[in-house]
Structure formats: C-alpha cells, structure tokens
C-alpha cells in the first residue's frame, strides 16, 4: 500500500516542503532513499522502539520510503514522526484520508514522546504558503509556530496522540497565539540602560547619531574608559523593532535553535558580542550542517566586536563581504 504525507526541510532561514512516500510490500527489508543524512537513517531504530513501547508492532514486511525532492539533503531527526506515521499508514494501522492536509514534523524519543526541533517558525510559514490545513509538531515548539496566522498549529506530546487523531478517536486542541499581543508582551526592558552612562557626552552623542541613522561606529580609547560599557547599552536607544523585523529576526534565531523556550517572538534588538578568538564559520555561518553565524544572529540589532586588534584577519574580510 502506498501512502503519501508531508514534512519539511530547512534551508538557510526558509523551509521547503518534503513529500514522504511510504510503500509496503512483500519482503523483510527497510529502504530509505531521497538523500537522507545519518541522523535520518538512524530514525529506524527510534521508530521501532517508540512503536513497541506504545503498543504498536513495527511492520514485518518490506518498507520503502522516498523523500522528495531528492536533490535536497534531509538532515536531522525531525523526520522521525512523519516517517513513523507514514509506515503505520502504509500498513493500514492509521487511516489515510486526512494525512495530506497536514504537515508533520518531530523528533521521537525511545518512549514515543516528542523532542523540540529547530526551525519551527519558517516551517510554519511554508505550511501556510502551501495551503496546509494544519501543522503537527512537538508541543515545545507550538507557541513559536502559532504566531503564523491562518494556520492551525497542534502541539503534541507523544506519537499516540497523533495516531489517535488520524484514526478519529482523539481531537487535538490547536495552539492559539495573538501575534501582536505576543509581540508587545515580549518587549521587555533591556538589561543595560543607556541612561546609566554618566559623562562622556561626546561619545554619547556619537552613539546617538549611529543609533538614529543605523551607522557603523568605531570607538578608540584607553582601557577602562567605558567603551564596552557604552556599547552594551546601545540597543536600549535603537528604534523599537517592528513586527515584520521581529518575525525576520525570530526566523534566524529559530533556525539556530537559540529561541528562549518561554518566548515565541524576539521583540527587542539582538546584541551579539563574539569572543575575539571566534572562528570564521562561527562569525559568518556555515559548516557541515549550515547554521547562522554571529553576523546573521545580529540582524536588526548590534554586532559588537571588542578588542579589534586581537581579532583574526579573516573577520575583517568577512565583514567587508557581508
């Protein structure tokens, strides 16, 4: 029996919908194709354990899973839940009439509970753009994804809830977040206030001009003269983030996995201060599994580079390119 359902792959700060096709036939082997990485291939063991613990038997037949488009590398363990649901649907354990209306994502523990994922916000945006009726994901990420309007977001605790939902024996309560209320609620006070600075009127004037016009600023002075202290207080005099800027900034931090678990939106200007020994990848981003670097994480905020004379030469070249 052939079953089709949908997951998502995060590329940069955007998400691409991934079609997951599962076919069951006579045999005893398990095939997973579509350019999966090691974490995706290891999902077989997590799925087997999660199903057994929750009273379901892994099918004793040949299972072929295809993840399309095949030219996009599928990375991470967030495909565990859609793969498990697809396998059960292909063998008749789950009804398939509602599967194609939902986007499913989540990492499984061995007991069937769900672990949080990275990039829930860009995935939710992609789900809304593609016209999905709902988005099923771990409950830890539900508020983050629910800031996207016109999309039903269902936060689930374990795989049993998802199975019962598709079989019609349980209803899932959507997570509802008023985006504007959440935005204003998260506009907290800055930990460092520019009003605390006493004296240094010329430097304060330069900082105010830089903040008002969005200019770069180079501060030179003797050790202990207050350069770092004043730089840390610069975000408190920057213009407030707009809602569009907040969503843009939150997407970047969501992909990097740096969102506070109690907050679904970043509503204040970010302040990033990387160490002077920061590597090129940490500064610009990238790596084997591409992640945003300090430059991206400081988007719409302040990137503070202290002790410039001790930084590696590649930092300056990267900043010129950026």
Please report, for each region that a protein language model flagged, where it lies by residue.
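Walker A/P-loop
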Residues: 218-263
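Conserved alpha-helical scaffold flanking the Walker A/P-loop in AAA+ ATPase domains
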Residues: 206-208, 264-265, 269-270, 280-303
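Conserved AAA+/SF3 P-loop NTPase catalytic/coupling segment centered on the Walker-B
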Residues: 275, 279, 291-322
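Alpha-helical scaffold elements adjacent to nucleotide-binding pockets in ATP/GTP-utilizing enzyme cores
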Residues: 46, 50, 83, 122-126, ...
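Beta-to-alpha transition at the N-cap of a short helix in the ABC ATPase nucleotide-binding domain
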Residues: 203, 243, 314-316
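Peripheral, non-AAA+ core regions of ATP-driven protein-machinery
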Residues: 1-229, 266
């Amino acid at each position: 029996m052939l079953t089709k359902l949908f997951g998502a792959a995060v590329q940069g700060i955007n998400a691409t919908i991934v079609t997951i096709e599962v076919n069951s036939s006579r045999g005893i082997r398990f095939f997973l194709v579509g350019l999966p990485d090691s974490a995706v291939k290891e999902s077989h063991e997590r799925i087997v354990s999660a199903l057994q613990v929750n009273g379901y038997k892994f099918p004793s037949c040949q299972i072929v899973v295809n993840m399309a488009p095949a030219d996009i590398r599928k990375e991470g363990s967030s495909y565990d839940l859609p793969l498990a649901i697809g396998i059960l649907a292909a063998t008749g354990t789950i009804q398939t009439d509602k599967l194609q209306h939902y986007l499913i994502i989540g990492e499984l523990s061995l007991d069937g509970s769900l672990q949080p994922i990275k990039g829930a916000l860009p995935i939710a945006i992609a789900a809304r753009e593609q016209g999905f009726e709902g988005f099923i994901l771990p409950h830890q990420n539900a508020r983050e994804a629910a800031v996207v309007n016109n999309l039903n977001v269902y936060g689930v605790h374990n795989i049993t809830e998802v199975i019962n939902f598709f079989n019609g024996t349980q209803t899932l309560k959507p997570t509802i977040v008023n985006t504007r209320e959440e935005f204003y609620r998260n506009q907290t006070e800055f930990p460092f206030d520019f009003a605390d600075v006493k004296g240094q009127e010329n430097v304060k004037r330069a900082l105010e001009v830089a903040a008002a016009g969005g200019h770069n600023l180079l501060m030179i002075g003797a050790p202990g003269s207050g350069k770092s202290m004043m730089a840390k207080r610069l975000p408190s005099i920057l213009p407030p983030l707009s809602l569009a800027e907040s969503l843009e900034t939150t997407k970047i931090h969501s992909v990097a996995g740096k969102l506070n678990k109690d907050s679904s939106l970043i509503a204040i200007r970010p302040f990033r201060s990387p160490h002077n020994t920061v590597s090129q990848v940490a500064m610009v981003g990238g790596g084997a599994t591409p992640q945003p670097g300090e430059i991206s994480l400081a988007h719409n905020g302040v990137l503070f580079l202290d002790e410039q004379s001790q930084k590696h030469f590649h930092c300056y070249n990267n900043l010129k390119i950026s």
